[in-house]
Protein backbone atom coordinates (compact mmCIF):
# COMPACT_ATOMS: atom_id res chain seq x y z
CA UNK A 1 0.00 0.00 0.00
CA UNK A 2 0.94 3.65 -0.29
CA UNK A 3 1.44 5.80 2.80
CA UNK A 4 0.27 9.41 2.70
CA UNK A 5 2.88 11.04 4.91
CA UNK A 6 2.83 14.72 5.89
CA UNK A 7 4.78 15.75 2.81
CA UNK A 8 2.28 14.03 0.50
CA UNK A 9 -0.70 15.54 2.34
CA UNK A 10 0.84 18.99 1.88
CA UNK A 11 1.40 18.28 -1.81
CA UNK A 12 -2.21 17.16 -2.20
CA UNK A 13 -3.48 20.45 -0.71
CA UNK A 14 -0.96 22.61 -2.53
CA UNK A 15 -1.07 21.10 -6.03
CA UNK A 16 -3.72 18.38 -6.54
CA UNK A 17 -2.97 17.98 -10.25
CA UNK A 18 0.71 17.26 -9.58
CA UNK A 19 -0.21 14.87 -6.77
CA UNK A 20 -2.50 12.82 -9.01
CA UNK A 21 -0.07 12.91 -11.89
CA UNK A 22 2.89 11.69 -9.84
CA UNK A 23 1.25 9.40 -7.29
CA UNK A 24 0.92 5.65 -7.82
CA UNK A 25 -1.68 5.74 -5.08
CA UNK A 26 -4.19 7.62 -7.26
CA UNK A 27 -6.00 8.84 -4.15
CA UNK A 28 -9.77 9.16 -4.63
CA UNK A 29 -9.34 8.62 -8.35
CA UNK A 30 -13.08 8.48 -8.86
CA UNK A 31 -13.60 11.95 -7.42
CA UNK A 32 -12.67 15.37 -8.73
CA UNK A 33 -9.13 16.12 -7.52
CA UNK A 34 -9.53 19.86 -7.28
CA UNK A 35 -12.88 19.67 -5.53
CA UNK A 36 -11.55 17.12 -3.07
CA UNK A 37 -8.50 19.22 -2.26
CA UNK A 38 -10.65 22.32 -1.82
CA UNK A 39 -13.08 20.51 0.46
CA UNK A 40 -10.24 18.89 2.34
CA UNK A 41 -8.68 22.27 3.03
CA UNK A 42 -11.74 24.42 3.68
CA UNK A 43 -14.81 22.34 4.52
CA UNK A 44 -16.12 22.75 8.04
CA UNK A 45 -17.47 19.22 7.86
CA UNK A 46 -14.12 17.46 7.60
CA UNK A 47 -12.31 18.12 10.84
CA UNK A 48 -8.54 18.12 10.82
CA UNK A 49 -8.40 16.16 14.05
CA UNK A 50 -10.47 13.33 12.58
CA UNK A 51 -8.38 13.26 9.41
CA UNK A 52 -5.17 13.33 11.38
CA UNK A 53 -6.33 10.43 13.54
CA UNK A 54 -7.59 8.47 10.52
CA UNK A 55 -4.34 9.08 8.66
CA UNK A 56 -2.38 7.89 11.67
CA UNK A 57 -4.42 4.68 11.86
CA UNK A 58 -4.02 4.02 8.14
CA UNK A 59 -0.29 4.71 8.23
CA UNK A 60 0.19 2.38 11.18
CA UNK A 61 -1.61 -0.44 9.39
CA UNK A 62 0.29 0.17 6.20
CA UNK A 63 3.63 0.15 7.98
CA UNK A 64 2.80 -3.21 9.46
CA UNK A 65 2.19 -4.50 5.94
CA UNK A 66 5.55 -3.01 4.85
CA UNK A 67 4.17 -1.95 1.53
CA UNK A 68 5.30 1.53 0.58
CA UNK A 69 4.41 1.97 -3.08
CA UNK A 70 1.69 -0.47 -4.04
CA UNK A 71 -1.78 -1.59 -2.99
CA UNK A 72 -1.99 -5.06 -1.50
CA UNK A 73 -4.26 -7.44 -3.48
CA UNK A 74 -7.52 -8.37 -1.76
CA UNK A 75 -8.41 -12.06 -1.60
CA UNK A 76 -12.01 -11.70 -0.43
CA UNK A 77 -13.63 -8.33 -0.95
CA UNK A 78 -16.97 -8.32 0.83
CA UNK A 79 -19.05 -6.55 3.47
CA UNK A 80 -16.99 -8.05 6.29
CA UNK A 81 -13.90 -6.50 4.70
CA UNK A 82 -15.24 -2.94 4.92
CA UNK A 83 -16.58 -3.52 8.47
CA UNK A 84 -13.11 -4.61 9.55
CA UNK A 85 -11.54 -1.52 7.96
CA UNK A 86 -14.08 0.78 9.65
CA UNK A 87 -13.39 -0.88 12.99
CA UNK A 88 -9.72 -0.08 12.44
CA UNK A 89 -10.83 3.56 12.15
CA UNK A 90 -12.80 3.31 15.44
CA UNK A 91 -16.10 3.99 13.70
CA UNK A 92 -19.24 3.35 15.76
CA UNK A 93 -22.43 1.59 14.67
CA UNK A 94 -24.02 -1.82 14.16
CA UNK A 95 -24.34 -4.14 11.20
CA UNK A 96 -27.08 -6.58 10.28
CA UNK A 97 -26.39 -9.69 8.23
CA UNK A 98 -29.44 -11.04 6.39
CA UNK A 99 -30.47 -14.67 6.79
CA UNK A 100 -30.08 -14.99 3.02
CA UNK A 101 -26.60 -13.86 1.98
CA UNK A 102 -27.79 -12.92 -1.50
CA UNK A 103 -29.67 -10.03 0.14
CA UNK A 104 -27.97 -6.81 1.23
CA UNK A 105 -26.40 -6.49 4.68
CA UNK A 106 -26.99 -3.22 6.52
CA UNK A 107 -24.62 -0.81 8.23
CA UNK A 108 -26.48 1.32 10.78
CA UNK A 109 -25.15 4.57 12.27
CA UNK A 110 -26.67 7.02 14.75
CA UNK A 111 -27.66 10.38 13.23
CA UNK A 112 -25.53 12.04 15.90
CA UNK A 113 -22.50 10.04 14.66
CA UNK A 114 -23.12 10.71 10.97
CA UNK A 115 -20.45 13.38 10.51
CA UNK A 116 -17.74 11.41 12.27
CA UNK A 117 -18.71 8.22 10.46
CA UNK A 118 -18.68 9.81 7.00
CA UNK A 119 -15.22 11.24 7.63
CA UNK A 120 -13.93 7.77 8.50
CA UNK A 121 -15.89 6.05 5.75
CA UNK A 122 -14.53 8.37 3.04
CA UNK A 123 -11.01 8.03 4.36
CA UNK A 124 -11.41 4.25 4.34
CA UNK A 125 -12.63 3.95 0.77
CA UNK A 126 -9.99 6.47 -0.27
CA UNK A 127 -7.07 4.70 1.37
CA UNK A 128 -8.34 1.37 0.00
CA UNK A 129 -8.76 2.89 -3.49
CA UNK A 130 -12.37 1.73 -3.77
CA UNK A 131 -15.04 2.91 -6.16
CA UNK A 132 -18.27 4.16 -4.59
CA UNK A 133 -21.72 4.16 -6.18
CA UNK A 134 -25.14 4.52 -4.59
CA UNK A 135 -28.81 4.70 -5.46
CA UNK A 136 -30.15 8.24 -5.23
CA UNK A 137 -33.53 9.46 -6.47
CA UNK A 138 -34.14 6.19 -8.27
CA UNK A 139 -30.82 6.16 -10.14
CA UNK A 140 -27.38 4.69 -9.58
CA UNK A 141 -25.06 7.59 -8.98
CA UNK A 142 -21.30 7.90 -9.50
CA UNK A 143 -20.34 10.79 -7.21
CA UNK A 144 -17.83 13.27 -8.57
CA UNK A 145 -16.77 14.94 -5.33
CA UNK A 146 -16.75 14.66 -1.58
CA UNK A 147 -19.15 17.61 -1.40
CA UNK A 148 -21.63 15.71 -3.56
CA UNK A 149 -21.44 12.64 -1.35
CA UNK A 150 -21.75 14.77 1.77
CA UNK A 151 -24.77 16.66 0.48
CA UNK A 152 -26.56 13.52 -0.71
CA UNK A 153 -26.01 11.47 2.43
CA UNK A 154 -27.03 14.26 4.79
CA UNK A 155 -30.38 14.53 3.00
CA UNK A 156 -31.52 10.90 3.38
CA UNK A 157 -32.11 8.35 6.13
CA UNK A 158 -30.86 5.30 4.22
CA UNK A 159 -29.17 4.48 0.94
CA UNK A 160 -28.11 1.38 -1.00
CA UNK A 161 -24.37 1.54 -1.71
CA UNK A 162 -22.03 -0.40 -3.95
CA UNK A 163 -18.30 -0.68 -3.32
CA UNK A 164 -15.98 -2.15 -5.93
CA UNK A 165 -12.27 -2.62 -6.43
CA UNK A 166 -9.81 -3.67 -9.11
CA UNK A 167 -7.48 -5.15 -6.50
CA UNK A 168 -8.88 -8.70 -6.69
CA UNK A 169 -7.74 -11.33 -9.16
CA UNK A 170 -11.31 -12.49 -9.72
CA UNK A 171 -14.10 -10.23 -10.97
CA UNK A 172 -16.62 -12.40 -9.11
CA UNK A 173 -15.42 -11.00 -5.76
CA UNK A 174 -14.69 -7.43 -6.77
CA UNK A 175 -17.92 -5.72 -5.66
CA UNK A 176 -20.80 -5.87 -3.22
CA UNK A 177 -23.92 -3.91 -2.22
CA UNK A 178 -24.97 -2.93 1.28
CA UNK A 179 -27.48 -0.57 2.87
CA UNK A 180 -26.25 2.40 4.88
CA UNK A 181 -28.81 3.55 7.47
CA UNK A 182 -28.89 6.51 9.83
CA UNK A 183 -30.86 5.90 13.02
CA UNK A 184 -32.77 8.51 15.01
CA UNK A 185 -32.15 8.63 18.73
CA UNK A 186 -34.77 9.31 21.41
CA UNK A 187 -34.08 9.48 25.12
CA UNK A 188 -35.58 5.99 25.53
CA UNK A 189 -34.92 4.21 22.24
CA UNK A 190 -33.08 4.14 18.91
CA UNK A 191 -35.25 3.98 15.79
CA UNK A 192 -33.92 2.36 12.61
CA UNK A 193 -35.19 3.89 9.34
CA UNK A 194 -36.29 0.50 7.95
CA UNK A 195 -37.52 -2.77 9.42
CA UNK A 196 -34.96 -5.51 10.08
CA UNK A 197 -34.88 -9.12 11.30
CA UNK A 198 -34.21 -8.16 14.96
CA UNK A 199 -36.10 -5.01 15.88
CA UNK A 200 -36.70 -1.62 14.26
CA UNK A 201 -37.11 0.06 17.65
CA UNK A 202 -34.22 -0.65 20.01
CA UNK A 203 -34.96 0.23 23.63
CA UNK A 204 -31.88 1.67 25.29
CA UNK A 205 -32.36 -0.25 28.52
CA UNK A 206 -32.00 -3.49 26.50
CA UNK A 207 -28.40 -2.60 25.58
CA UNK A 208 -27.24 -0.97 28.79
CA UNK A 209 -24.94 -3.93 29.50
CA UNK A 210 -23.36 -4.32 26.05
CA UNK A 211 -21.38 -2.18 23.60
CA UNK A 212 -23.94 -1.65 20.82
CA UNK A 213 -23.66 1.92 19.47
CA UNK A 214 -20.94 2.59 22.03
CA UNK A 215 -17.81 0.95 20.67
CA UNK A 216 -16.87 -0.24 17.19
CA UNK A 217 -19.05 -1.59 14.39
CA UNK A 218 -20.78 -4.50 16.13
CA UNK A 219 -23.26 -7.18 15.11
CA UNK A 220 -26.82 -6.17 16.01
CA UNK A 221 -27.40 -9.75 17.19
CA UNK A 222 -25.35 -8.82 20.29
CA UNK A 223 -28.60 -7.39 21.66
CA UNK A 224 -28.68 -10.74 23.48
CA UNK A 225 -26.06 -13.19 24.69
CA UNK A 226 -28.22 -16.03 23.31
CA UNK A 227 -28.39 -17.16 19.67
CA UNK A 228 -31.25 -15.66 17.68
CA UNK A 229 -34.11 -18.07 16.96
CA UNK A 230 -33.37 -17.96 13.21
CA UNK A 231 -29.68 -18.69 13.78
CA UNK A 232 -28.25 -22.20 13.70
CA UNK A 233 -26.57 -23.36 16.91
CA UNK A 234 -25.27 -26.59 15.39
CA UNK A 235 -22.23 -27.41 13.26
CA UNK A 236 -22.49 -28.43 9.62
CA UNK A 237 -19.80 -30.51 7.91
CA UNK A 238 -19.14 -31.12 4.23
CA UNK A 239 -18.54 -34.54 2.65
CA UNK A 240 -17.08 -35.22 -0.78
CA UNK A 241 -16.68 -38.57 -2.49
CA UNK A 242 -13.73 -38.49 -4.87
CA UNK A 243 -11.94 -40.76 -7.29
CA UNK A 244 -8.98 -40.32 -9.62
CA UNK A 245 -8.95 -42.66 -12.61
CA UNK A 246 -5.25 -41.88 -13.14
CA UNK A 247 -4.29 -43.32 -9.76
CA UNK A 248 -2.13 -46.41 -10.51
CA UNK A 249 -3.42 -48.51 -7.63
CA UNK A 250 -7.00 -47.65 -8.55
CA UNK A 251 -6.38 -48.64 -12.18
CA UNK A 252 -5.04 -52.05 -11.16
CA UNK A 253 -8.05 -52.74 -8.96
CA UNK A 254 -10.45 -51.47 -11.61
CA UNK A 255 -9.01 -53.81 -14.27
CA UNK A 256 -9.22 -56.73 -11.85
CA UNK A 257 -12.87 -56.23 -10.90
CA UNK A 258 -14.37 -54.58 -13.99
CA UNK A 259 -17.15 -56.76 -15.43
CA UNK A 260 -17.03 -57.94 -19.04
CA UNK A 261 -20.00 -55.81 -20.14
CA UNK A 262 -19.87 -52.03 -20.61
CA UNK A 263 -22.38 -49.55 -19.21
CA UNK A 264 -22.50 -46.02 -17.87
CA UNK A 265 -21.79 -47.51 -14.45
CA UNK A 266 -18.41 -48.75 -15.71
CA UNK A 267 -17.55 -45.87 -18.06
CA UNK A 268 -14.18 -44.34 -17.16
CA UNK A 269 -15.68 -40.87 -17.61
CA UNK A 270 -17.54 -41.54 -14.37
CA UNK A 271 -14.17 -41.69 -12.59
CA UNK A 272 -12.37 -38.93 -14.53
CA UNK A 273 -10.64 -36.21 -12.51
CA UNK A 274 -9.80 -32.83 -14.01
CA UNK A 275 -9.11 -31.34 -10.60
CA UNK A 276 -12.79 -30.53 -10.07
CA UNK A 277 -12.20 -31.11 -6.36
CA UNK A 278 -9.74 -28.22 -6.29
CA UNK A 279 -12.30 -25.88 -7.83
CA UNK A 280 -15.12 -27.24 -5.68
CA UNK A 281 -13.09 -26.47 -2.56
CA UNK A 282 -12.38 -22.98 -3.89
CA UNK A 283 -16.10 -22.45 -4.41
CA UNK A 284 -16.89 -23.57 -0.86
CA UNK A 285 -14.22 -21.40 0.73
CA UNK A 286 -15.49 -18.44 -1.26
CA UNK A 287 -19.23 -19.03 -0.87
CA UNK A 288 -19.73 -21.50 2.00
CA UNK A 289 -17.35 -20.52 4.78
CA UNK A 290 -19.82 -21.66 7.48
CA UNK A 291 -18.63 -25.27 7.06
CA UNK A 292 -16.89 -26.67 10.17
CA UNK A 293 -14.93 -29.56 8.65
CA UNK A 294 -14.50 -31.11 5.20
CA UNK A 295 -14.31 -34.90 4.84
CA UNK A 296 -13.10 -36.34 1.52
CA UNK A 297 -13.99 -40.01 1.06
CA UNK A 298 -11.85 -41.92 -1.44
CA UNK A 299 -9.95 -45.10 -2.30
CA UNK A 300 -7.23 -43.09 -4.07
CA UNK A 301 -4.20 -41.19 -2.87
CA UNK A 302 -4.87 -37.51 -2.09
CA UNK A 303 -4.05 -35.12 -4.95
CA UNK A 304 -0.58 -33.59 -4.73
CA UNK A 305 -1.94 -30.05 -4.44
CA UNK A 306 -4.13 -30.77 -1.37
CA UNK A 307 -2.81 -29.53 1.97
CA UNK A 308 -3.69 -32.24 4.46
CA UNK A 309 -2.15 -30.13 7.22
CA UNK A 310 -5.11 -27.78 6.96
CA UNK A 311 -7.12 -28.54 10.14
CA UNK A 312 -10.38 -28.21 8.25
CA UNK A 313 -9.54 -31.08 5.84
CA UNK A 314 -9.76 -34.78 6.68
CA UNK A 315 -9.00 -37.52 4.14
CA UNK A 316 -11.15 -40.64 4.71
CA UNK A 317 -10.26 -43.94 3.05
CA UNK A 318 -13.03 -46.43 2.23
CA UNK A 319 -11.74 -48.93 4.78
CA UNK A 320 -12.42 -46.39 7.55
CA UNK A 321 -16.17 -46.47 6.92
CA UNK A 322 -16.80 -49.76 5.05
CA UNK A 323 -16.13 -53.39 6.04
CA UNK A 324 -13.28 -55.26 4.33
CA UNK A 325 -15.82 -57.64 2.79
CA UNK A 326 -17.18 -54.77 0.67
CA UNK A 327 -13.80 -53.59 -0.64
CA UNK A 328 -12.68 -52.55 -3.10
CA UNK A 329 -15.75 -50.83 -4.48
CA UNK A 330 -16.34 -48.71 -7.56
CA UNK A 331 -20.00 -48.03 -6.84
CA UNK A 332 -21.12 -44.68 -5.53
CA UNK A 333 -24.31 -46.39 -4.35
CA UNK A 334 -22.20 -48.64 -2.10
CA UNK A 335 -20.09 -45.79 -0.73
CA UNK A 336 -23.21 -43.74 0.00
CA UNK A 337 -24.58 -46.45 2.30
CA UNK A 338 -21.74 -45.65 4.73
CA UNK A 339 -21.21 -41.88 4.84
CA UNK A 340 -22.79 -41.64 8.30
CA UNK A 341 -20.00 -43.89 9.61
CA UNK A 342 -17.32 -41.24 9.03
CA UNK A 343 -15.53 -40.81 12.39
CA UNK A 344 -16.22 -37.44 13.99
CA UNK A 345 -18.80 -36.23 11.49
CA UNK A 346 -21.47 -33.80 12.66
CA UNK A 347 -25.10 -34.92 12.79
CA UNK A 348 -25.79 -32.30 10.14
CA UNK A 349 -23.73 -32.45 6.98
CA UNK A 350 -23.84 -31.61 3.30
CA UNK A 351 -23.03 -34.32 0.80
CA UNK A 352 -21.48 -33.06 -2.39
CA UNK A 353 -19.62 -34.34 -5.42
CA UNK A 354 -16.46 -32.79 -6.78
CA UNK A 355 -18.45 -31.61 -9.83
CA UNK A 356 -20.87 -29.52 -7.71
CA UNK A 357 -19.75 -25.87 -7.50
CA UNK A 358 -21.27 -23.06 -5.44
CA UNK A 359 -21.90 -19.94 -7.49
CA UNK A 360 -22.94 -17.37 -4.86
CA UNK A 361 -22.60 -16.66 -1.12
CA UNK A 362 -24.52 -19.16 1.02
CA UNK A 363 -25.01 -19.85 4.70
CA UNK A 364 -26.42 -22.59 6.91
CA UNK A 365 -29.96 -21.47 6.20
CA UNK A 366 -29.64 -22.53 2.56
CA UNK A 367 -29.34 -26.15 3.72
CA UNK A 368 -31.10 -26.48 7.08
CA UNK A 369 -33.74 -24.59 9.01
CA UNK A 370 -32.58 -23.39 12.41
CA UNK A 371 -34.61 -26.19 14.05
CA UNK A 372 -32.63 -28.83 12.13
CA UNK A 373 -35.13 -29.64 9.39
CA UNK A 374 -33.25 -30.33 6.16
CA UNK A 375 -33.90 -28.40 2.96
CA UNK A 376 -34.30 -30.53 -0.16
CA UNK A 377 -33.91 -29.51 -3.78
CA UNK A 378 -36.01 -32.11 -5.55
CA UNK A 379 -36.50 -31.79 -9.29
CA UNK A 380 -39.63 -29.96 -10.41
CA UNK A 381 -40.78 -33.00 -12.38
CA UNK A 382 -41.08 -36.67 -11.52
CA UNK A 383 -39.72 -39.61 -13.52
CA UNK A 384 -39.39 -42.47 -11.03
CA UNK A 385 -41.96 -45.20 -11.68
CA UNK A 386 -42.17 -48.77 -12.88
CA UNK A 387 -40.04 -51.79 -12.08
CA UNK A 388 -36.29 -52.26 -12.18
CA UNK A 389 -35.28 -53.18 -15.70
CA UNK A 390 -31.97 -54.48 -17.01
CA UNK A 391 -30.28 -51.98 -19.31
CA UNK A 392 -32.09 -48.92 -17.97
CA UNK A 393 -30.13 -46.21 -16.07
CA UNK A 394 -28.69 -47.51 -12.81
CA UNK A 395 -29.64 -44.31 -10.93
CA UNK A 396 -33.26 -44.89 -11.97
CA UNK A 397 -33.28 -48.52 -10.90
CA UNK A 398 -31.73 -47.53 -7.57
CA UNK A 399 -34.51 -44.99 -7.06
CA UNK A 400 -37.16 -47.56 -8.02
CA UNK A 401 -35.89 -49.99 -5.38
CA UNK A 402 -35.91 -47.19 -2.80
CA UNK A 403 -39.42 -46.25 -3.88
CA UNK A 404 -40.63 -49.76 -3.09
CA UNK A 405 -39.41 -49.37 0.49
CA UNK A 406 -41.02 -45.94 0.82
CA UNK A 407 -44.40 -47.16 -0.44
CA UNK A 408 -44.44 -49.97 2.12
CA UNK A 409 -43.42 -47.64 4.96
CA UNK A 410 -45.51 -44.52 4.27
CA UNK A 411 -48.30 -45.78 1.98
CA UNK A 412 -47.50 -43.04 -0.53
CA UNK A 413 -45.76 -43.10 -3.89
CA UNK A 414 -42.91 -40.78 -4.84
CA UNK A 415 -41.48 -39.80 -8.23
CA UNK A 416 -38.97 -36.93 -7.89
CA UNK A 417 -35.19 -37.28 -7.94
CA UNK A 418 -32.93 -34.86 -6.12
CA UNK A 419 -31.27 -32.28 -8.34
CA UNK A 420 -27.56 -32.58 -9.14
CA UNK A 421 -26.60 -30.31 -6.25
CA UNK A 422 -25.25 -30.44 -2.67
CA UNK A 423 -27.56 -32.46 -0.43
CA UNK A 424 -28.59 -31.69 3.15
CA UNK A 425 -28.12 -34.86 5.22
CA UNK A 426 -28.52 -35.99 8.82
CA UNK A 427 -26.61 -38.91 10.27
CA UNK A 428 -29.39 -39.78 12.74
CA UNK A 429 -31.81 -40.36 9.86
CA UNK A 430 -29.24 -42.42 7.93
CA UNK A 431 -28.60 -44.63 10.98
CA UNK A 432 -32.35 -45.02 11.42
CA UNK A 433 -32.78 -46.14 7.80
CA UNK A 434 -29.83 -48.53 8.00
CA UNK A 435 -31.38 -50.16 11.06
CA UNK A 436 -34.79 -50.38 9.37
CA UNK A 437 -33.52 -51.73 6.03
CA UNK A 438 -30.42 -53.80 6.92
CA UNK A 439 -30.74 -56.29 4.06
CA UNK A 440 -31.06 -53.60 1.38
CA UNK A 441 -28.20 -51.54 2.82
CA UNK A 442 -25.90 -54.58 3.08
CA UNK A 443 -26.66 -55.80 -0.44
CA UNK A 444 -25.95 -52.38 -1.96
CA UNK A 445 -22.84 -52.01 0.18
CA UNK A 446 -21.33 -55.20 -1.30
CA UNK A 447 -21.93 -54.46 -4.99
CA UNK A 448 -18.62 -53.57 -6.67
CA UNK A 449 -20.34 -51.51 -9.36
CA UNK A 450 -23.81 -50.03 -9.53
CA UNK A 451 -26.22 -52.94 -9.87
CA UNK A 452 -29.84 -53.73 -10.62
CA UNK A 453 -30.69 -54.51 -6.99
CA UNK A 454 -29.11 -51.36 -5.48
CA UNK A 455 -31.00 -48.83 -3.42
CA UNK A 456 -30.07 -45.19 -4.00
CA UNK A 457 -29.59 -44.14 -0.37
CA UNK A 458 -28.48 -40.53 -0.80
CA UNK A 459 -29.86 -40.16 -4.31
CA UNK A 460 -33.46 -40.98 -3.40
CA UNK A 461 -34.30 -42.93 -0.24
CA UNK A 462 -32.97 -40.43 2.31
CA UNK A 463 -34.73 -37.38 0.88
CA UNK A 464 -38.19 -38.89 0.65
CA UNK A 465 -37.84 -40.76 3.95
CA UNK A 466 -36.90 -37.49 5.69
CA UNK A 467 -39.67 -35.59 3.89
CA UNK A 468 -42.40 -38.12 4.67
CA UNK A 469 -41.30 -38.41 8.31
CA UNK A 470 -41.44 -34.62 8.83
CA UNK A 471 -37.70 -33.95 9.02
CA UNK A 472 -37.17 -32.28 5.64
CA UNK A 473 -38.94 -29.75 3.45
CA UNK A 474 -38.66 -28.81 -0.19
CA UNK A 475 -36.57 -25.72 -1.05
CA UNK A 476 -37.18 -23.36 -3.96
CA UNK A 477 -33.46 -22.77 -4.66
CA UNK A 478 -32.50 -23.04 -8.31
CA UNK A 479 -29.66 -25.31 -9.41
CA UNK A 480 -28.02 -25.89 -12.79
CA UNK A 481 -27.03 -29.17 -14.45
CA UNK A 482 -24.62 -29.02 -17.40
CA UNK A 483 -23.94 -32.09 -19.55
CA UNK A 484 -22.23 -32.62 -22.88
CA UNK A 485 -25.57 -33.29 -24.62
CA UNK A 486 -26.81 -29.83 -23.52
CA UNK A 487 -25.98 -26.48 -25.09
CA UNK A 488 -23.18 -26.52 -22.54
CA UNK A 489 -21.22 -23.56 -23.88
CA UNK A 490 -24.25 -21.29 -23.57
CA UNK A 491 -25.07 -22.57 -20.09
CA UNK A 492 -21.53 -22.12 -18.80
CA UNK A 493 -21.16 -18.65 -20.30
CA UNK A 494 -24.47 -17.61 -18.74
CA UNK A 495 -23.25 -18.58 -15.25
CA UNK A 496 -20.00 -16.65 -15.81
CA UNK A 497 -21.92 -13.56 -16.94
CA UNK A 498 -24.33 -13.64 -13.99
CA UNK A 499 -21.40 -14.14 -11.59
CA UNK A 500 -19.54 -11.13 -12.96
CA UNK A 501 -22.73 -9.07 -12.64
CA UNK A 502 -23.29 -10.40 -9.09
CA UNK A 503 -26.84 -11.16 -10.19
CA UNK A 504 -27.67 -13.38 -7.22
CA UNK A 505 -31.39 -13.49 -8.02
CA UNK A 506 -30.77 -15.26 -11.32
CA UNK A 507 -27.68 -17.24 -10.33
CA UNK A 508 -28.34 -20.86 -9.35
CA UNK A 509 -27.30 -22.04 -5.90
CA UNK A 510 -24.88 -24.42 -7.56
CA UNK A 511 -23.84 -25.74 -10.96
CA UNK A 512 -23.01 -29.37 -11.72
CA UNK A 513 -20.47 -30.20 -14.44
CA UNK A 514 -21.75 -33.70 -15.10
CA UNK A 515 -19.47 -36.18 -16.85
CA UNK A 516 -20.76 -39.47 -18.21
CA UNK A 517 -21.41 -41.34 -21.47
CA UNK A 518 -17.70 -41.05 -22.35
CA UNK A 519 -17.77 -37.24 -22.14
CA UNK A 520 -14.01 -37.31 -21.55
CA UNK A 521 -13.62 -38.08 -25.27
CA UNK A 522 -15.40 -34.83 -26.24
CA UNK A 523 -12.57 -32.30 -26.76
CA UNK A 524 -14.83 -29.22 -26.95
CA UNK A 525 -16.55 -30.26 -23.71
CA UNK A 526 -13.21 -30.65 -21.94
CA UNK A 527 -11.94 -27.28 -23.19
CA UNK A 528 -15.08 -25.39 -22.16
CA UNK A 529 -15.23 -27.03 -18.72
CA UNK A 530 -11.61 -26.15 -17.91
CA UNK A 531 -12.15 -22.59 -19.14
CA UNK A 532 -15.26 -22.26 -16.98
CA UNK A 533 -13.54 -23.55 -13.84
CA UNK A 534 -10.50 -21.32 -14.24
CA UNK A 535 -12.64 -18.26 -14.99
CA UNK A 536 -15.02 -18.65 -12.08
CA UNK A 537 -12.50 -19.77 -9.44
CA UNK A 538 -9.00 -18.52 -10.35
CA UNK A 539 -7.77 -17.94 -6.78
CA UNK A 540 -6.15 -20.76 -4.79
CA UNK A 541 -7.92 -21.72 -1.57
CA UNK A 542 -6.29 -22.23 1.81
CA UNK A 543 -6.69 -25.97 1.18
CA UNK A 544 -3.99 -25.90 -1.50
CA UNK A 545 -0.26 -26.19 -0.88
From Swiss-Prot:
InterPro entries: Stealth, Stealth_CR1, Stealth_CR2, Stealth_CR3, Stealth_CR4. Its EC number is 2.7.-.-. It is an enzyme of class 2 (transferase). Keywords: Exopolysaccharide synthesis, Transferase. GO terms for molecular function: transferase activity, transferring phosphorus-containing groups. This is Capsular polysaccharide phosphotransferase SacB. Belongs to the stealth family. It comes from Neisseria meningitidis serogroup A. May be the polymerase that links individual UDP-N-acetyl-D-mannosamine monomers. In serotype A the capsule is composed of repeated units of (alpha 1-6)-linked N-acetyl-D-mannosamine-1-phosphate. Stealth proteins are part of a protein family that is conserved from bacteria to higher eukaryotes. Family members were first identified in microbes as proteins that help pathogens to elude the host innate immune system. Microbial stealth proteins are involved in the biosynthesis of exopolysaccharides. Stealth proteins are predicted to function as hexose-1-phosphoryltransferases. One of its GO terms (biological process) is polysaccharide biosynthetic process.
Amino acid sequence: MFILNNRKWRKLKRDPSAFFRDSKFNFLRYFSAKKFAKNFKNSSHIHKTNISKAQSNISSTLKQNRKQDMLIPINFFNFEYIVKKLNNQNAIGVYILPSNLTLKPALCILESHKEDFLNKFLLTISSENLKLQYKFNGQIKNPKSVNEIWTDLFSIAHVDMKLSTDRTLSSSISQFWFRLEFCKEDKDFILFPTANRYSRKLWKHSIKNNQLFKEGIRNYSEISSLPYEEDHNFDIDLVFTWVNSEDKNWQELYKKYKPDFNSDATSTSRFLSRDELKFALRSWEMNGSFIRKIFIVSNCAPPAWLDLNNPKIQWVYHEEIMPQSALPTFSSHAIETSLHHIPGISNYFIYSNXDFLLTKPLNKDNFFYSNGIAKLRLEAWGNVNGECTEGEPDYLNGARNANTLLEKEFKKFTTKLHTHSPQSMRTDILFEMEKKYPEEFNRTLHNKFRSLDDIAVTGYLYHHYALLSGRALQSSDKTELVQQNHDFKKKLNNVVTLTKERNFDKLPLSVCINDGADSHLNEEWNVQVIKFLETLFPLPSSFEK
